[in-house]
């Protein structure tokens, strides 16, 4: 079973700090950003400290392919403005090139919002963007990993059929999927009352063979709300029992599962949530314990 969280790139330590932070939580996989997730600034490759990070991973028996990278949140590959979309394509191309140099494989990406241009038009632009990015990085084995979205605003890819359309149209084994439990629940997939049918539907439409990463988050909102507000593990409307099914589902044991749950009084909850997950027992006092740290 692979469980971890997103971590910071920790100032001057960069990826060294990311790895050490993940290990302090008891993680055996984790997700990083190559720069601040809210902007496009990136430090020179030499300052990422990737070689030392790889030593830390090797000593901890963590496969580098279980270190996931998340693209900047502001990227929009469905952007109808040509120049803005070109900027996004160039940025993701560079992100993949840096990942290839380090040995990272999976780049999780919010595919984009159609900006009132319509879902079909948005998906067509995402497809075109993916094709350009993959052509720009054709020597690499990196994978563009489409995150399932909640359907907030004009987001694309809140339905499995949207993702199927992209995968089929791009036609490359370098396209995969990141399933976010909060997002699919908020999008209207009732994993609480219909877990097996939702997973079977995903398999029928997208294919479990395309599932590369799982974001394991609870939701502050009800099913179908299209809100995208994460809650701590077991403390939202999805609940502990359903989320623990995802973590220990035999079909998903080899897939990295990443917590993106909110801080509790400015304290990261991941060490405590991971311990609770490993114990398979819900602790209703967990948030109180974290807040007292």
Task: Map each language-model feature to its residues.
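Active-site beta-loop-alpha junctions enriched in small/polar residues
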Residues: 6-10, 35-37, 72-74, 112-114, ...
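Acidic/histidine-rich catalytic cores of soluble enzymes
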Residues: 30, 132-233
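N-terminal pre-domain/capping segments
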Residues: 1-71, 75-97, 283-293
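Acidic (Asp/Glu)-rich catalytic clusters
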Residues: 19-26, 46-68, 95-103, 134-140, ...
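Conserved active-site loop/cleft motifs that coordinate metal ions or position small ligands
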Residues: 31, 212-215, 254-261
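Active-site acidic/histidine proton-transfer and metal-coordination neighborhood
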Residues: 77-176
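Conserved, mostly hydrophobic/aromatic
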Residues: 22, 70, 88, 99, ...
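Short, electropositive alpha-helical surface patch
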Residues: 81-94, 119-132, 159-169, 195-200, ...
């Amino acid at each position: 079973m692979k469980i971890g969280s997103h971590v910071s790139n920790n100032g001057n330590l960069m990826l060294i700090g990311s790895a050490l932070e993940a290990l302090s939580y008891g993680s055996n996989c984790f997700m990083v950003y190559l720069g601040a997730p809210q902007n496009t600034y990136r430090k020179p490759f030499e300052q990422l400290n990737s070689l030392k990070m790889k030593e830390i991973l090797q000593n901890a028996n963590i496969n580098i392919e279980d270190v996931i990278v998340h693209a900047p949140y502001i990227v929009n590959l469905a952007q109808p403005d040509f120049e803005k979309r070109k900027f996004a394509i160039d940025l993701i191309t560079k992100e993949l090139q840096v990942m290839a140099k380090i040995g990272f494989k999976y780049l999780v990406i919010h595919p984009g919002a159609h900006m009132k241009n319509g879902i079909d038009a948005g998906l067509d632009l995402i497809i075109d963007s993916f094709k350009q990015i993959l052509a720009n990085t054709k020597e690499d084995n990196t994978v563009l990993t489409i995150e399932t979205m909640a359907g907030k605003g004009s987001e694309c890819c809140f339905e499995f059929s949207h993702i199927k359309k992209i995968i089929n149209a791009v036609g490359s084994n370098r396209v995969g999927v990141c399933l976010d439990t909060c997002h699919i629940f908020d999008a209207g997939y009732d994993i609480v009352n219909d877990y097996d049918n939702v997973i079977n539907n995903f398999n029928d439409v997208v294919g479990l063979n395309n599932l590369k990463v799982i974001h394991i988050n609870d939701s502050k909102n009800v099913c179908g709300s299209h809100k995208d507000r994460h809650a701590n593990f077991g403390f939202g409307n999805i609940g502990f029992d359903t989320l623990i099914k995802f973590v220990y589902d035999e079909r998903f044991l080899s897939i990295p599962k990443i917590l993106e749950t909110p801080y509790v009084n400015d304290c990261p909850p991941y060490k405590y949530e991971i311990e609770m997950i490993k114990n398979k027992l819900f602790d209703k006092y967990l948030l109180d314990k974290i807040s007292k740290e």
